[in-house]
């Protein structure tokens, strides 16, 4: 009995011990498995996204499919910016190593095809820390074909061609600041490319494929394609022909007047706000946007670079020179990319008088018979300094029309006093001078105008700001602000919102967005607008802007000459540099187009009087002579205008002399007869040549004229009679443009055919006449 009890107790002990052992084992097992469990939890739950992504990257390859960027067109569907297909070449060093490729041989071959240093390519291929090493950028189809053939011939794994696109600007420098450019990442920078990047860019696609343990693609195992979306195309209001005409005449003016700091200009529809042309010169080529286009600036930068590179690398002089060079290069690039028409404020000078007079007439502060007197200078109440008119001898007695025609500062100071600071400020505000225009381009500024108190609280601040402001001095606005404001003066009093993009189309040609003219607010009454149109036209017919005349067109406008009062030389002295400008409008019976041309810092070495009337007015006149016929504005010639009318000669041979003379008379031409007989056998000018109205045509009867060439004389500085005599002596004709007054002070300032050029007898030479006497 006792033995059985002991046996039972032993078994019970063994059972309890066993349970304890099992429990301890379970606990130890749990403790041992805990890190593994936590690790599994981390892998499968906490960091699931990370490891899933890592596995996906190891098992798949993603290739980017670049979206085609949309095109940019002018209003006539001429392509201003487009994209062409190119390819990038990249190496996968890891893949090259896995495939045991002959790296030196690959480097030599690619170096030869791409024109790159083989040693550099070999270094890229050896960098196994990276899976993507680009060795060729935007190569053409022919070069890509050579690389593709090499890959296939050698069976190489690790060299890849990546399709992409390259932006191309067919018109090169034309409207460069408006169109803008794209950077190396194909993102829009500057101009329309930047402002409408979200439309133009489209969306990038991708192809995802699996890859095996040898890093080769396995497209039949798995492939996922996310298509790209082609960018939308943008149609501008810009007209490439009008833009080219504007830039041509601005370039000619820069050369003619030795302009030191470039020029800017604008052509706008004053009824709608559409921009037909917008130019900043000097310009740049967006195909090579990092290259400095101005030769003088480029030479200075090269010299800076040469100087610092001559210093020991790492020395203080080297580092300082390198920094200075980098800053100068960056500043030069930003300057050539800058659209001055919307981004830079300038003192508008006397062009602003149009707004001051409009305001004064509109509110009744003056009328057309308000008298003024200019003696050349006057001590205006509330001004510390004596006010001077641009004409030192004064204009004498004048009324409101003459005040504008003469661009008289003294008269406008008194107009401002009659208008008063409160009304002056409110009208200026209404004209949009204190706000951005809202144009659909990036980088617009709004200029800098007076604080309201400076012009309204004359008891405290005097009248200097009010009176100087009346003729466009001591404040700054942008060229576009000025043009928009003056447009409202002549279009019936409607301030328009200017715009550069007329329509956006998707890849299928569907309209995504279409712009419409937008009236911001009214500025003056229709009656005041009608009056101002008459006054503005009289500035060209009788005032300081006679040099802007174009035969057959009714043109109005206002000249401006402003000092750059915030520019100082290296000694801290204020320079005497000027910006000369002219705003022209046509046709004045129903204004449609407004054109601004401004020349920044004409040289004093040319001997030509620096003023808007002498320099900018004929520049705008030349633009109008080019673009108004193209834009469909009808010409109407009076007897006085005939010398500026171009008549295309018909073929008169075979006609009777009587019939030929009758036809010429109908065209406003006369005839001289050479030879005898009844039938015309030859003529000078030849058929198809142009001849000015009122000219004499030489008809040959019974004989044929021998072809004759003559050298074009230098007409520069000749008056109308002298030029006519010189041309007639050589059998040439002259087409008169610009100032058509017959006086000794009106002389030739430009000719369309260079002196000593050989041309056929009977050729018409276009001469620009201008009065170079002192004019505002």
Would you name each region that the model predicts?
Residues 65-68, 75, 83-86, 130, ...:
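Extracytoplasmic
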Residues 131, 143, 275, 287, ...:
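Extracytoplasmic/secreted cell-surface and envelope-processing proteins
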Residues 175-177, 274, 354-355, 483-486, ...:
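Short, solvent-exposed alpha-helical surface patches in non-cytosolic proteins
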Residues 119-130, 259-272, 373-377, 444-445, ...:
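Acidic/histidine-enriched alpha-helical segments
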Residues 515, 552, 556, 566, ...:
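Ligand-recognition elements built from short beta-strands and adjacent flexible loops
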Residues 2-6, 81, 212-225, 271-350, ...:
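Beta-lactam-recognizing serine transpeptidase/beta-lactamase-like catalytic domain environment
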Residues 1-319, 336, 345, 422-429, ...:
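Periplasmic/cell-envelope proteins involved in peptidoglycan metabolism and beta-lactam response
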């Amino acid at each position: 009995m006792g033995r059985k009890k002991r046996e039972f107790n032993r078994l019970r002990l063994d059972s309890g011990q066993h349970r304890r052992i099992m429990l301890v084992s379970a606990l130890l097992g749990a403790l041992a498995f805990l890190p593994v469990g936590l690790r599994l939890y981390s892998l499968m739950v906490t960091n699931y996204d990370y490891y899933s992504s890592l596995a996906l990257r190891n098992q798949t390859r993603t290739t980017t499919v670049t979206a085609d960027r949309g095109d940019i067109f002018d209003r006539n569907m001429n392509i201003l910016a487009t994209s062409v297909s190119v390819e990038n070449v990249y190496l996968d060093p890891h893949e090259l190593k896995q495939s045991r490729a002959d790296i030196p041989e690959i480097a030599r071959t690619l170096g030869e095809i791409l024109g790159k240093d083989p040693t550099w390519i070999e270094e890229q291929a050896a960098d196994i820390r990276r899976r993507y090493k680009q060795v060729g950028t935007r190569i053409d189809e022919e070069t890509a074909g050579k690389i593709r053939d090499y890959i296939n011939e050698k069976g190489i794994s690790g060299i890849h061609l990546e399709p992409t696109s390259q932006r191309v600007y067919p018109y090169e420098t034309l409207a460069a600041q408006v169109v803008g450019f794209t950077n190396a990442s194909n993102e829009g920078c500057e101009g329309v490319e930047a402002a409408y990047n979200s439309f133009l860019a489209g969306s990038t696609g991708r192809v995802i494929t699996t890859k095996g343990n040898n890093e080769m693609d396995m497209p039949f195992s798995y492939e996922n394609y996310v298509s790209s979306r082609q960018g939308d195309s943008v149609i501008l209001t810009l007209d490439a022909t009008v833009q080219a005409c504007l830039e041509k005449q601005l370039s000619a003016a820069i050369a003619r007047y030795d302009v030191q700091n470039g020029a800017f200009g604008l052509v706008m529809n004053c009824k709608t706000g559409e921009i037909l042309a917008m130019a900043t010169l000097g310009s740049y080529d967006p195909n090579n946007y990092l290259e400095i286009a101005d030769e003088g600036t480029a030479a200075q930068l090269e010299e800076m670079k040469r100087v610092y590179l001559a210093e020991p690398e790492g020395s203080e002089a080297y580092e300082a020179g390198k920094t200075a060079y980098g800053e100068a290069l960056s500043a030069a690039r930003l300057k050539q990319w800058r659209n001055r028409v919307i981004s830079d404020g300038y003192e508008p000078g006397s062009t602003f008088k149009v707004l001051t007079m409009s305001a004064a007439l509109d509110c009744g502060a003056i009328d057309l018979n308000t008298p003024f007197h200019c003696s050349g200078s006057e001590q205006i109440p509330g001004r510390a300094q004596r006010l001077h008119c641009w004409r030192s001898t004064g204009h004498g007695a004048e009324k409101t029309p003459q005040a504008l025609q003469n661009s008289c500062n003294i008269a406008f100071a008194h107009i401002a006093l009659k208008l008063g600071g409160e009304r002056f400020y409110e009208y200026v505000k209404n004209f949009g001078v204190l706000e951005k225009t809202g144009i659909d381009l990036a980088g617009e500024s709004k200029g800098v105008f007076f604080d309201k108190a400076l012009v309204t609280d004359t008891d405290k601040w005097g009248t200097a700001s009010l009176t100087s402001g009346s003729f466009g001095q001591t404040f700054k606005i942008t060229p576009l602000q000025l043009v928009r404001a003056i447009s409202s003066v002549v279009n019936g009093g409607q301030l328009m919102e200017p715009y550069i993009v007329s329509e956006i189309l998707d890849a299928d040609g569907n309209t995504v967005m279409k712009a419409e003219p937008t009236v911001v607010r009214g500025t003056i009454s229709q009656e005041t607008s009608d009056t101002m149109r008459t006054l503005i036209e009289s500035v060209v017919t009788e005032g300081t802007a006679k040099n802007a005349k174009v035969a057959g067109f009714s043109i109005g406008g206002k000249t401006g000459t402003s000092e750059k009062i915030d520019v100082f030389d290296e000694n801290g002295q204020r320079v005497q540099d000027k910006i000369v400008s002219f705003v022209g409008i046509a046709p004045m019976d129903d204004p449609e187009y407004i054109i601004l041309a401004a020349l920044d810092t004409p040289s004093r070495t040319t001997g030509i009087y620096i003023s808007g009337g002498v320099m900018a007015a004929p520049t705008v006149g030349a633009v109008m002579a080019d673009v108004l016929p193209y834009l469909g504005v009808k010409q109407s010639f009076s007897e006085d205008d005939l010398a500026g009318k171009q008549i295309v000669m018909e073929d008169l041979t075979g006609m009777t002399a009587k019939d030929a003379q009758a036809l010429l008379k109908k065209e406003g031409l006369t005839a001289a007869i050479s030879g005898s007989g009844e039938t015309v056998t030859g003529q000078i000018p030849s058929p198809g040549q142009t001849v000015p109205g009122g000219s004499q045509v030489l008809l040959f009867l019974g004989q044929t004229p021998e072809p004759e060439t003559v050298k074009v004389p230098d007409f520069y500085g000749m008056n109308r009679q002298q030029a006519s005599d010189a041309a007639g002596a050589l059998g040439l004709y002259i087409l008169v443009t610009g100032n058509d007054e017959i006086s000794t002070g009106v002389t030739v300032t430009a000719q369309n055919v260079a002196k000593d050029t050989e041309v056929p007898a009977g050729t018409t030479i276009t001469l620009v006449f201008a009065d170079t006497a002192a004019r505002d």
